[in-house]
From Swiss-Prot:
GO molecular function: carbohydrate binding
Jacalin-type lectin domain span: 12-154
Organism: Arabidopsis thaliana (Mouse-ear cress)
Descriptive protein name: Jacalin-related lectin 19
InterPro entries the UniProt entry points to: Jacalin-like_lectin_dom (IPR001229), Jacalin-like_lectin_dom_plant (IPR033734), Jacalin-like_lectin_dom_sf (IPR036404)
Annotated Gene3D superfamilies: Jacalin-like lectin domain (2.100.10.30)
UniProt keyword GTP-binding, yes or no: no
CDD domains: Jacalin (cd09612)
Family the entry assigns: Belongs to the jacalin lectin family.
Length: 176
């Protein structure tokens, strides 16, 4: 892991996963943000793929999940002005003896709400980031999206301090 990746990792936190333990583990890693999300779904979330931003360029993830589902939705954020700040959804088994899968997802940005996609049935989950953003996803998938977790950036206090300094400087010029 290079110094940039280590620095990025130190500025992020992980939340989740929500869902079941079927399928195989995946982790897209840590990026600068999310540009687009593509969901295929019907009675559950069949698959998810994401286009992240890495140093100002798009970086496409693999598709996580199966080939089912007859509805497709593409969420195109107005990145970098718009970014993901929260996700909610539901998970439960598709059949009585099966393991839980993600049944529904709703995405919240700093500008609007996208969804819900899928069926809002089962155990609910929700989280939101106060001052940060979603910068990566991970989970488990097989025939469906079995579970989902997120890498979140922490608020960068230096940016906030610099903004405050500029505002204070501007105010002192007006008062003087």
């Amino acid at each position: 892991m290079d110094q940039q990746q280590q620095g990025d990792k130190n500025l992020t936190v992980f939340v989740g996963p929500w869902g079941g333990n079927g399928g195989t583990t995946w982790d897209d890693g840590i990026y600068d943000g999310v540009r687009e999300i593509r969901l295929v779904y019907d009675h559950c979330i069949d698959s998810i793929s994401v286009i992240y931003d890495k140093n100002g360029k798009p970086a496409k993830s693999e598709k996580h999940g199966g080939v089912g589902g007859n509805k497709t939705s593409e969420i195109k954020l107005q990145y970098p002005e718009e970014y993901l700040t929260g996700v909610s959804g539901y998970y439960c088994p598709m059949v009585n003896s099966g393991t839980p899968v993600i049944r529904s997802m709703t995405f919240k940005s700093n500008k609007q709400v996208y969804g819900p996609y899928g069926v809002e049935q089962g155990t609910p989950f929700t989280f939101s980031v106060n001052g940060g953003r979603i910068v990566g996803m991970n989970g488990r998938s097989g025939w469906y999206l079995d579970s989902i977790g997120f890498h979140l950036s922490r608020p960068k206090s230096t940016k906030m301090i610099n903004k405050l300094r500029k505002k204070i400087h501007w105010l002192t010029r007006i008062v003087a």
